[in-house]
């Protein structure tokens, strides 16, 4: 039960860094340029820093930081492989991918 609550809070916080990404990038109609994608990718480290600045959020910083890592090392921000990616981040990655598949983009843009 303890891990479930921990994972739930990490999940709630996983995209907190997007609050600091320019709205023009978050709501862009069409694919991002390489430069825009590099800016978008910073939401992971920004989210980590937000959590680390708050003692109550600090334990949950792995969710925002590692949720875009991939088992084969092709993810970001660190290019970690399976054994080095925290389990909670792997769970969030799967949930985030599922959400991206089933949530209409117009809804996503409205909440940012």
Show where each model-derived region lies.
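Histidine- and acidic-residue-rich, metal-dependent catalytic cores
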Residues: 1-112
């Amino acid at each position: 039960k303890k891990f479930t609550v921990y994972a739930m809070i990490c999940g709630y916080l996983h995209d907190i860094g997007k609050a600091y990404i320019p709205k023009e990038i978050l709501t862009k109609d069409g694919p991002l340029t390489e430069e825009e994608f590099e800016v978008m990718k910073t939401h992971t480290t920004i989210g980590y820093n937000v959590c680390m600045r708050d003692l109550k959020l600090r334990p949950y910083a792995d969710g925002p930081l590692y949720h875009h890592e991939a088992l084969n090392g092709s993810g970001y921000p660190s290019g970690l492989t399976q054994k080095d990616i925290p389990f909670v981040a792997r769970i969030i990655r799967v949930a985030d991918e599922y959400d991206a598949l089933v949530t209409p983009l117009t809804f996503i843009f409205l909440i940012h």
